[in-house]
Amino acid sequence: IVAPYLSEADQAILRNLAAPYGNEVCFYYPPKDLLQCFSIKKFGKRISMATYYRCMFSSILPESLEKVLYLDCDIVILGDISEFWNTDLSGCGAACVEDIGKDEDERYERLHYDKSCSYFNAGVLLINLDYWRKHKVDVQCVRYFETYPERIQFNDQDLLNVVLCKDKVFVPLKWNMQDGFYRYGIDKRVADWQAFREELLHP
Protein backbone atom coordinates (compact mmCIF):
# COMPACT_ATOMS: atom_id res chain seq x y z
CA ILE A 1 0.00 0.00 0.00
CA VAL A 2 1.39 3.36 -1.06
CA ALA A 3 0.19 6.31 0.98
CA PRO A 4 1.48 9.60 2.38
CA TYR A 5 0.61 8.41 5.89
CA LEU A 6 -1.36 5.70 7.70
CA SER A 7 -1.88 5.50 11.44
CA GLU A 8 -0.91 2.38 13.39
CA ALA A 9 -4.62 1.66 13.84
CA ASP A 10 -5.26 1.84 10.10
CA GLN A 11 -2.28 -0.39 9.39
CA ALA A 12 -3.57 -2.95 11.88
CA ILE A 13 -6.99 -2.99 10.22
CA LEU A 14 -5.46 -3.66 6.82
CA ARG A 15 -3.16 -6.38 8.17
CA ASN A 16 -6.10 -8.07 9.86
CA LEU A 17 -8.06 -8.03 6.60
CA ALA A 18 -5.21 -9.74 4.76
CA ALA A 19 -4.21 -12.26 7.43
CA PRO A 20 -7.04 -14.81 6.92
CA TYR A 21 -5.94 -15.20 3.29
CA GLY A 22 -2.29 -15.76 4.18
CA ASN A 23 -1.28 -12.43 2.66
CA GLU A 24 1.13 -9.84 3.95
CA VAL A 25 0.53 -6.10 3.66
CA CYS A 26 3.53 -3.89 2.89
CA PHE A 27 3.42 -0.13 3.39
CA TYR A 28 5.40 2.41 1.39
CA TYR A 29 5.55 6.08 2.35
CA PRO A 30 7.05 8.21 -0.45
CA PRO A 31 8.82 11.52 0.28
CA LYS A 32 6.40 14.39 0.76
CA ASP A 33 7.90 16.34 -2.13
CA LEU A 34 7.63 13.49 -4.65
CA LEU A 35 4.45 14.86 -6.21
CA GLN A 36 5.19 18.56 -5.90
CA CYS A 37 5.24 19.18 -9.66
CA PHE A 38 1.76 17.72 -10.22
CA SER A 39 -1.73 19.12 -9.69
CA ILE A 40 -5.24 17.72 -9.94
CA LYS A 41 -6.86 18.70 -13.23
CA LYS A 42 -10.23 16.96 -13.00
CA PHE A 43 -12.40 15.16 -10.44
CA GLY A 44 -10.74 17.08 -7.61
CA LYS A 45 -13.65 16.37 -5.26
CA ARG A 46 -13.08 12.62 -5.39
CA ILE A 47 -9.44 12.24 -6.42
CA SER A 48 -6.44 13.28 -4.34
CA MET A 49 -2.85 13.96 -5.29
CA ALA A 50 -2.12 10.35 -4.34
CA THR A 51 -3.38 9.34 -7.79
CA TYR A 52 -0.01 10.45 -9.18
CA TYR A 53 1.79 7.80 -7.14
CA ARG A 54 0.74 5.51 -9.98
CA CYS A 55 3.25 7.30 -12.23
CA MET A 56 6.02 6.86 -9.69
CA PHE A 57 5.82 3.17 -8.78
CA SER A 58 9.22 2.41 -10.30
CA SER A 59 10.89 4.74 -7.81
CA ILE A 60 8.62 3.95 -4.85
CA LEU A 61 8.57 0.16 -4.88
CA PRO A 62 11.67 -1.95 -4.12
CA GLU A 63 13.86 -3.06 -7.01
CA SER A 64 13.31 -6.68 -5.97
CA LEU A 65 9.85 -6.40 -7.57
CA GLU A 66 9.88 -7.02 -11.32
CA LYS A 67 6.19 -6.32 -11.86
CA VAL A 68 3.14 -5.21 -9.91
CA LEU A 69 -0.61 -5.39 -10.42
CA TYR A 70 -2.31 -2.08 -9.71
CA LEU A 71 -6.06 -2.10 -8.97
CA ASP A 72 -8.25 0.90 -8.24
CA CYS A 73 -9.90 0.69 -4.81
CA ASP A 74 -13.36 0.18 -6.38
CA ILE A 75 -12.36 -2.90 -8.38
CA VAL A 76 -14.34 -6.07 -7.64
CA ILE A 77 -12.59 -9.35 -8.44
CA LEU A 78 -14.99 -12.17 -9.29
CA GLY A 79 -12.60 -14.94 -10.27
CA ASP A 80 -9.06 -16.19 -10.76
CA ILE A 81 -6.81 -13.45 -12.19
CA SER A 82 -3.69 -15.58 -12.63
CA GLU A 83 -4.17 -15.55 -16.42
CA PHE A 84 -3.93 -11.77 -16.39
CA TRP A 85 -0.97 -11.83 -13.98
CA ASN A 86 0.87 -14.14 -16.37
CA THR A 87 0.43 -11.83 -19.38
CA ASP A 88 3.66 -11.58 -21.38
CA LEU A 89 5.13 -8.12 -20.75
CA SER A 90 8.26 -8.59 -22.86
CA GLY A 91 9.27 -5.27 -24.37
CA CYS A 92 6.34 -3.29 -23.03
CA GLY A 93 5.57 -1.18 -19.99
CA ALA A 94 2.13 -2.45 -19.03
CA ALA A 95 -0.83 -4.66 -19.82
CA CYS A 96 -4.11 -2.77 -19.80
CA VAL A 97 -7.66 -2.48 -21.14
CA GLU A 98 -8.87 0.16 -23.56
CA ASP A 99 -10.87 2.98 -22.00
CA ILE A 100 -14.55 3.49 -22.72
CA GLY A 101 -13.61 6.92 -24.11
CA LYS A 102 -10.95 5.60 -26.48
CA ASP A 103 -12.84 6.78 -29.58
CA GLU A 104 -12.99 10.43 -28.51
CA ASP A 105 -10.78 12.35 -30.96
CA GLU A 106 -10.38 15.18 -28.45
CA ARG A 107 -8.11 13.08 -26.26
CA TYR A 108 -5.55 12.47 -28.99
CA GLU A 109 -5.67 16.04 -30.25
CA ARG A 110 -5.17 17.36 -26.73
CA LEU A 111 -2.37 14.95 -25.82
CA HIS A 112 -0.73 15.16 -29.25
CA TYR A 113 -0.34 11.50 -30.11
CA ASP A 114 -1.78 9.28 -32.82
CA LYS A 115 -5.21 7.73 -32.31
CA SER A 116 -3.90 4.42 -33.64
CA CYS A 117 -2.16 3.99 -30.27
CA SER A 118 -5.58 4.08 -28.59
CA TYR A 119 -6.17 5.11 -24.95
CA PHE A 120 -6.28 2.83 -21.91
CA ASN A 121 -8.04 2.95 -18.58
CA ALA A 122 -5.50 3.13 -15.75
CA GLY A 123 -7.77 1.57 -13.12
CA VAL A 124 -6.24 -1.86 -13.74
CA LEU A 125 -2.60 -2.04 -14.78
CA LEU A 126 -0.16 -4.91 -14.84
CA ILE A 127 3.08 -2.92 -14.67
CA ASN A 128 6.47 -4.08 -15.87
CA LEU A 129 8.61 -2.37 -13.22
CA ASP A 130 11.87 -3.43 -14.85
CA TYR A 131 10.78 -1.68 -18.04
CA TRP A 132 9.65 1.42 -16.13
CA ARG A 133 13.01 1.69 -14.40
CA LYS A 134 14.98 1.17 -17.61
CA HIS A 135 12.95 3.76 -19.53
CA LYS A 136 12.50 6.15 -16.59
CA VAL A 137 8.73 6.29 -16.90
CA ASP A 138 8.47 8.34 -13.72
CA VAL A 139 10.86 10.98 -15.07
CA GLN A 140 9.01 11.08 -18.39
CA CYS A 141 5.71 11.70 -16.59
CA VAL A 142 7.19 14.56 -14.59
CA ARG A 143 8.78 16.16 -17.65
CA TYR A 144 5.60 15.94 -19.71
CA PHE A 145 3.49 17.48 -16.96
CA GLU A 146 5.99 20.29 -16.38
CA THR A 147 6.22 21.00 -20.12
CA TYR A 148 2.55 20.63 -21.11
CA PRO A 149 0.36 21.04 -18.01
CA GLU A 150 -2.42 22.50 -20.15
CA ARG A 151 -2.78 19.22 -22.04
CA ILE A 152 -3.54 17.13 -18.96
CA GLN A 153 -7.18 16.54 -18.06
CA PHE A 154 -7.46 13.04 -16.65
CA ASN A 155 -4.50 13.46 -14.33
CA ASP A 156 -2.02 10.55 -14.17
CA GLN A 157 -4.08 8.48 -16.60
CA ASP A 158 -3.36 11.02 -19.34
CA LEU A 159 0.33 11.06 -18.47
CA LEU A 160 0.67 7.30 -18.58
CA ASN A 161 -1.17 7.10 -21.89
CA VAL A 162 1.28 9.56 -23.43
CA VAL A 163 4.42 8.00 -21.98
CA LEU A 164 3.33 4.41 -22.72
CA CYS A 165 1.73 5.30 -26.04
CA LYS A 166 3.64 2.64 -27.99
CA ASP A 167 4.82 0.54 -25.07
CA LYS A 168 1.77 -1.32 -23.83
CA VAL A 169 -0.22 -4.46 -24.61
CA PHE A 170 -4.00 -4.56 -24.57
CA VAL A 171 -5.84 -7.41 -22.87
CA PRO A 172 -9.52 -8.43 -23.11
CA LEU A 173 -12.20 -6.20 -21.68
CA LYS A 174 -13.05 -8.74 -18.96
CA TRP A 175 -9.94 -7.70 -17.01
CA ASN A 176 -11.26 -4.17 -16.50
CA MET A 177 -14.99 -4.01 -17.12
CA GLN A 178 -15.61 -0.30 -16.61
CA ASP A 179 -18.96 0.78 -15.20
CA GLY A 180 -19.60 3.01 -18.20
CA PHE A 181 -20.17 -0.05 -20.37
CA TYR A 182 -23.13 -0.96 -18.18
CA ARG A 183 -24.46 2.60 -18.01
CA TYR A 184 -24.00 3.51 -21.67
CA GLY A 185 -23.78 0.13 -23.36
CA ILE A 186 -21.54 -1.01 -26.19
CA ASP A 187 -22.13 -0.23 -29.84
CA LYS A 188 -23.74 -3.39 -31.22
CA ARG A 189 -22.34 -2.61 -34.66
CA VAL A 190 -18.84 -3.61 -33.62
CA ALA A 191 -17.65 -6.87 -35.14
CA ASP A 192 -16.93 -8.52 -31.81
CA TRP A 193 -20.19 -7.51 -30.13
CA GLN A 194 -20.86 -11.10 -29.04
CA ALA A 195 -17.51 -11.27 -27.22
CA PHE A 196 -18.23 -7.93 -25.53
CA ARG A 197 -21.66 -9.21 -24.51
CA GLU A 198 -20.14 -12.27 -22.87
CA GLU A 199 -17.64 -10.11 -20.99
CA LEU A 200 -20.40 -7.81 -19.80
CA LEU A 201 -22.28 -10.81 -18.43
CA HIS A 202 -19.19 -12.54 -17.02
CA PRO A 203 -16.50 -9.93 -16.14
Q: What kind of feature is each model-predicted range?
A:
Residues 5-12, 104:
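Short, charged/polar "capping" segments at the starts of alpha-helices
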Residues 9-10, 15-60:
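Active-site-proximal specificity loops/subdomain of glycosyltransferases
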Residues 9-13, 81, 181-183:
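A short acidic (Asp/Glu
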Residues 29-35, 50-104, 126-127, 133-135:
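GT-A fold catalytic core of metal-dependent nucleotide-sugar glycosyltransferases
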Residues 37-49, 108-113, 185-190:
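Short, surface-exposed amphipathic charged segments that create phosphate/polyanion-binding patches used
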Residues 95-102, 117-203:
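Catalytic core and acceptor-binding pocket of nucleotide-sugar-dependent glycosyltransferases
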